[in-house]
């Protein structure tokens, strides 16, 4: 919505047919269209880069294009582990790093399963976007009682000081216990704040505990506590 306000036009569901000179030719709703541009940025996704590993040659099993691994990163050959993009799980640098920790722990006779439900995701735009856990739609598919709270950044003191009031925070909870199911942040410093939620989820903290964690003032992340208030109590101090 903010990008639309800034003049960005979206053509969702379009099928790109070709690119020639400075024109992109595409199909949308059965109509052939084109758009001229000074620059074209293509984002076509990623695939596991397993070329040159000779993994199949030594008998390692694949799951489609990726190397198949268990919860401790072992392949079907017990003394061979696969971490990072080659296993096709969650293709993020911090995921690969933690997968490495899990694999080394298992090699050293410790055990810690990889939990892909609690991996933060970050988008480095302005304002930033970060998220962890379930979306509201997914939470309502999996749980009978879901509470959702939102908090606008225009009600946050530090954001007002910095002049970065675009954005909001959203917290999704299990309605009976206050279990944290998901958190989504669209705000300045969003990628720095999501780590707090990662710690909270891995420590199985509840909404009540997050509300009573004292955040310093003025900071952007004190808005996080208010978003938990909004979700769990139905109201936040600075957005009444």
Language-model features, listed with the residues they occupy:
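Flexible, glycine-rich terminal cap/loop adjacent to redox cofactors
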Residues: 108, 125-135, 140-240
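A short alpha-helix-loop-beta-strand transition element characteristic
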Residues: 61-63, 110-118, 145-149
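Short gly/ser/thr-rich secondary-structure transition/capping motifs
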Residues: 21-27, 60-68, 154
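A short, glycine/Asx- and small/polar-enriched loop/turn
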Residues: 20-22, 77, 162-167
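Rossmann-like dinucleotide-binding cores of NAD(P)H-dependent redox enzymes
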Residues: 1-31, 89-97, 105-138
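FAD-site-proximal beta/loop scaffold in flavoenzymes
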Residues: 10, 34-106
